[in-house]
C-alpha cells in the first residue's frame, strides 16, 4: 500500500526516533496514561523527570522482590562522584509498612561538605495492597518538605512488587536531607475507615537513593579540621590511610595509635574506622596522614624543610588538588606525640595551613567509668543527656512512632538480685478520647516492662516513678511473681516508650457516614525524666570476650587507656601496625575519648610486671605458651585447641557470667597444620596481677591480621565474639569458653559470699547450719555466764 507524498514527509521524523527494545530502561508515561508496566513499550528519555512504575508480569517466573534498577540506567551516571544508598543503608534495615493512619515514613541522608550533588534520583520499590482503589491511591514523594512527584498506583500493580523511578531536585540537597514518603490510600469510595486493615503499602528496604555530582577542592585551611579526613555527614566507614617513611619506632607507633583513637572516638559505633598502614607509599586514592621526623621524611615530602618543633600541616597533592595530606612532623618522636595530643585536644585553635604546637599539658586525671560514650553510674542521669538529636522525645499522630533512648553501660555493672533500676518518668500528652484504652508502654531491649493508662488529667501531665526490673542468675525464683526478662548490661541497650491512643476516627457504616478530621495528638517525654544507676557495684566474671568486643572492657574502664599497655612485636610490619591502629581506634569508638594515657611496649618481661591490662598483638610470649589458662596456641601454620563443653557464643556468654568459680575443664586437645588464614582472640588473667586481664589478638601472617581487622570493624561479627576464645576463619567466628573464671572488681564481703555460694545450695546449707550452731553456742555461753553472775554475785 503506497502512501501519499505529503504523508511520507510527515512520518519521516518519526523514523529517526530510537526503537525501544527489551533492554531499554522504563521511563515515565504521559500524565494522562497509567504508569508504564513491564509489558508496555518504554517512552523516550525526555520524560525522565516523571515517576516510572513497573509492575511484575504474573506470567513471568519473577522473584517476589523487585529487581534492583541498574546504576547505569540513570541520568547522573556521568558525574565523577557517585553514591547509591539503600533505605537499609539509611537506617531502615526492615521494610516499612505504611497504613491509613501511620501513612508517612522519613529517611534521612547526608552529603559530605566536599561534595556537590548535581543529580539525584529515587529508585523506589514497594508493594501496594490488592484492595486499594487504583488512581485514587498514590504515593507522594517529598525532599526536604518540597513535593518531588506523585507515584500513582494502577490497577495492574495492585498486590505486586512495583518499581518506580522518581527524579529528585538536586538543588534542594544540602548537608542534611530528609526524604519523606506519604501514602494516600482508598479502598472504597464512600464511608471509609482510616484504620481499615486493607489500607497498606509495603516500602522495601532495597529502595535506593542515587546521587551524582562532583567533588569540591577544599582550601588548605586547618580551621576546617577534621575535614576532609573525617566528615560527620559521611555515613560510610571511616578509612584513613597512615604513611610512615619506614618501620616506625615504638613512640611513633604510639603517636599514630593516639591519633587513631581520636578519629575512632568521632566515628561512632555504627560507622567504625580503619587505618591502613604503608611505608613510604601513598594509597592510590583518598586522603592520608603522613608521619615524619627530621631526616626521615617519606619520599612524598622529601623536599620539605626541617621543622623546629611539633608541626601539623595540611597540604594538597600536586598531581591531584582534591586529595589532602595531613602532615604530622617533628624534630624527634616526642614532638610527634605532642603534635598528636594537640590534634586531639586543641584542634579548636587550628587555623591556616600550618600549626606549630607550643605546649600540651594535662591538668586533671581521668576517673574510672567516665567514658563519654558510657552513662554516668555515680548519679541519676537526665534524659536530656541521652539525646542523639533534637525532638527525640516528642511524637505526634494518631498512631505515633515509639520514642527510643540508647543506654550504653559498663559491662561490669553488678545488678545481681537487685530490686530494679529507678526510673523517674515525666510525660505530657493530648487528652485522648477514650481514657480506658489509651496507654503508655515502657520496654527495654524489646522486652515489655510496664504500661500506664493515659487519662484525662487537668494538667495533661503524668509522673510515674517505677523501677526497671532486672534479674541476675536467679531466674528460677519461686515466689510466683511474674519474671520480666533481664536488662542486658554491657552492649547497647534501648529504652522504648510507646504512646497508644484510642481515638474515634469516623464511621464505617454505609448507611450512616460521618466525616471526622484526624485529631492532632501529641505526646512528649520530659527531658527532666531521670534514670539512676548509682549505688551499683562493679564486679564481673572474666574472661568474657563479648565485654571486650562490644564495650572494649577492661581497657575502656579508664577512658584515656591510662591503665592499658599494648604489647607489639619488635620491628613490626605494616599489617601489624595497622592492627595496632585499628584495635586502639576501636577502643576509641567504644569510649568516645582519645587514648592519651596509652602505653606501648615490645618487651614482654617489662610489660607483664606493670599493674595494667595487657593487649597483646601477634604471637604470644613464650612464658604464656605453657599457661593452664591458654586454650588456643597459634604457631605459624600449626594451631592447637583445647575443646570445651560450650560450643555456642550465646551459652559461652551465659557461662562466663553465671557466677561459678569452678573450672570448665577441656574435653580434648586437637592440633592441626594448615596453610590458610587463621586468627584468634584469647582472654585470660594476668599471671602477676589477679585484678588485671590479658587479651591476645593472635595472628601469624598478614592474611591472619586481615581476619582480625575485619572482625573488629564489623558490628555483626563483633556480636559473635564471646567466651574465653574466639576463632576467626574465612567462614566466620567460632567462640567457646574453656578454663577458669576469675573476677575483677569488688563487692561487700557478705554479698561476695552470698553471690559465690548461690550456685552451691548444699554448701550454702552446710554453711548456714554451721553459722546457726555457732550462734547457738555463743548464745548458750552468754546465757550461762549471765546465770552464773546472777547466782554468784561478786562483792
Question: Positions of the model-derived regions?
Answer:
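Solvent-exposed alpha-helical segments and adjacent loops
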Residues: 25-795
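Sec-dependent N-terminal signal peptides
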Residues: 2-25
